[in-house]
Amino acid sequence: MPILLFLLDTSASMNQRSHLGTTYLDIAKGAVETFMKLRSRDPASRGDRYMLVTVEEPPYGIKAGWKENHATFMNELKNLQAVGLTTLGQSLRTAFDLLNLNRLVTGIDNYGQGRNPFFLEPSIIIVITDGSKLTTANGVQDELHLPLYSPLPGSELTKEPFRWDQRLFALVLRLPGASLVEQEQPPAVQFDESPITAMCDVTGGRSYSVTSQRILNQCLESLVQKVQSGVVIHFEKSGPDPPILEDGLTDPVRSVGSQPWHNCHKLIYVRPNPKTGVPLGHWPIPESFWPDQNSPTLPPRTSHPVVKFSCTDSEPMIIDKLPFDKYELEPSPLTQFILERKSPHSCWPVFVANSAKYSELGHPFGYLKASTALNCVNLFVLPYNYPVFLPLLDDLFKIHKNKPSLKWRQLFENYLKTMPPYYIGPLKKALRMMGAPNLMPDSMEYGLSYSVVSYLKKLSQQAKVESDRVIGSIGKKFPQETGIKVRSGSNALSLALRKDFKQLLQEITGEVPQRPMDLNMKEFAGFQIALLNKDIKPQTFRNAYDVPRTNLLDHLTRMRVNLLRSTRQFLKGQDEDQAHSIPIVQMGNYQEFLKHIPSPLRELDYDQPRRLHTFGNPFKLDKKGMMIDEADEFVSGNQNKHKRTGEPNMQGVPKRRRCMSPLLRSRPQSPAVINNHIGGKDPPISVNQVSPDLPKPVAVHKNTDLSNNATVNEATENHVADHFCDDLLITKSEPFGTLSSAALEATEGYAAEKDSNFRPNDISDVFLENTKETGDNESCLPNNNAAFTHRKRRLQQCRSYEEANIELKAQILKEIRKPGRKYGIIFTLLKDVQGDLQTRLLFLQNVIQEAARFKKRNLIEQLEGFLEEIHRRASQVNHLSSC
């Protein structure tokens, strides 16, 4: 995942215009967008991460960092303005610290345990500047200086502020202000002579001198090709030059003095695995010191390892199944020199100075070798001191047949003493892959000293805190100054040098009365000049001089209208059309507008206690359309105790169940209608399709009046009947309706009086008597009990018996929910059920189901006995009528 960090010079000098009419800052913004378009052509660009840094003071200069998305990056890029100084050194340090923010947390640098090229975070910093003088608060600088102090923990472990996988490139804008005759340009873009060029060379990058738009596009295409995964290594020649060329003659030119290929600061490509997309490797590049277990700290390392190569030709050594790493070198004078020798079968060993314990140069850890096709040069990384180790391995497998002798073990132990201890882990893994896992004991492990481990762990924790602080500060705006401080231009004179010195002495001694103090604003320490706030519009009605000359007549008319208008209304400082006139750039900024409008939903009232379930598990979620089926099994007599999952209802209609009543079984299959449509718009549903089941428990509305049509619309019931009122409109599907509070109180009072001498079987006669069909305009039957007079009066106002049954079921449900075993009022209310016998039986079935939901077993037994009595008497009536 390459990281592309753009460092844009936003100093005041970027406001200068080119011959194209655009400012340098606009050209820089366009260059960033063009680079992103060119980069998007590569499929590997999906994992790119873009960051944006300016030359403002940290942390305000960080516009887009680790957490910001692409939209934030583009928005911050468009809003950049060219103000301030050219503090390029401080901004570069900020950019490097931003890239190194998480390296200690992830352990990618692997301090003290070798450098792993396959542990990398490739980053490219692209600086776009005008190449003018570097200005700071202390003055003008001729050279680029990066601050030595860094607030980032662990920065002392590396001498330079950058790392070996970070490269710096600079686009120095040199576009003229006047159009010139375009001269013939050289084929290659020239380096720039600005101070940033030296910094680019140190990191492995380069600078570009941009003199025209065509060269800018050429530079951007070159930068896109520079986005490669790799690390920078400093190659340095050790020893004499190769004496003989391919033709057998010496080269007199290259044998005198230092040549460019003697010291190269170039990149080695670390290709990611095509399957995983992550680079893989086996062997590290050795450290430039021998690790000491007694050392409390680690010596600081250089950003780029210094790899020395010897020009002595040797044969490349490779053993079957031995893992090795192969890295291609970036084209450089060194690769050109090696390829010109045309010797693909010879190699030059490479070393790291002071990596061995007793040798200054160290032992070889790999070699440089030209490819067979002579088109590139590769760096092969092998085990440390491979000229000694590889012959030992060859003898082990070919001569000893993987059974080492005592002499071989002694040679192997001597080799281990010359190898840095951080090679133990990779060597164990390699031997395991080759089929010799027991050569090195498991007890042989390498680890840093306890003090170093504690130190690194402490640095990692501090780096995590610093990372959170920096990430949290990104996006904050620089605090605007309230005013410009005024300083006195001339130094204050001594009192003895003032002309009125004698008069001042007389005032102090009291000889002369004191003069009033003259207010001199220049001597006031806190005097400031207010800055003009562009966001605040001038109040032109306060100051006539703020009104433009072209708007005087319009402004006078507006002030006259406001003067004659009633004082109850707000004054208007602008026309209504002008209030909606905004620049085109701000028309699409909906997010800022949405922040100022009130929320359509009110805030939650946290003071009110949250309503819990009144039945069952209080932690159970309210599942819509889910039913508890244990009650069904209890009523139907099924002894299966296993729960089954309920099914969602079709438009609130429960799943069909087998009817328990023999009268209902023998009922002809006439399609009854279920009143479950909403607002009376949906078609009625046949009973052949669905049958009533346990209704869904919902809240029962209080203080409603069924005499009003609105109340009828709120009280609905899954009720089955043969005939329905055509004009009955139900607008809300609920299981039960409600009675008025007066009727409920009257019913409860009657139940308290009559419950002592209640007998359920006495009601069966009354329940069975009302068997005649009820029409649409049929009124409810009156009851002789005086306690129910008020309720009966309300029932007589109902337009159909369905509404009366809705009221009854609401009352019965309320009685079922009450604790205790006094069920007299329930059976009393059952006498008032209206409709034919089939409707009454279905009503009774629903009551039994509700009782089962609340586990009222005693009530269920009485209701079932009541149902059997009705069946028995109904059969007697049918027998007498048949006779």
From Swiss-Prot:
Annotated ranges, domain VWFA: 3-227
Localization terms from the record: Nucleus; Chromosome
Keyword vocabulary terms for this entry: Chromosome, Nucleus
One GO CC term on file: integrator complex
Pfam families: Beta-barrel_INTS6, INT_SG_DDX_CT_C, VWA_2
Keyword Endoplasmic reticulum: no
InterPro entries to which the protein is assigned, alphabetical: INT_SG_DDX_CT_C (IPR029307), Integrator_subunit6 (IPR051113), VWF_A (IPR002035), vWFA_dom_sf (IPR036465)
Short motif (Inhibitory loop): ranges: 626-633
GO molecular function, one term: protein-macromolecule adaptor activity
Function noted in UniProt: Component of the integrator complex, a multiprotein complex that terminates RNA polymerase II (Pol II) transcription in the promoter-proximal region of genes.
Domain notes: The inhibitory loop acts as a regulator of protein phosphatase 2A (PP2A) activity: Asp-629 and Glu-630 residues mimic phosphoserine and phosphothreonine residues and bind to the PP2A catalytic subunit PPP2CA active site to block substrate-binding.
Subunit field text: Component of the Integrator complex, composed of core subunits INTS1, INTS2, INTS3, INTS4, INTS5, INTS6, INTS7, INTS8, INTS9/RC74, INTS10, INTS11/CPSF3L, INTS12, INTS13, INTS14 and INTS15. The core complex associates with protein phosphatase 2A subunits PPP2CA and PPP2R1A, to form the Integrator-PP2A (INTAC) complex.
Family from the record: Belongs to the Integrator subunit 6 family.
Protein name: Integrator complex subunit 6-A
Species assigned in the record: Xenopus laevis (African clawed frog)
Gene assigned in the entry: ints6-a
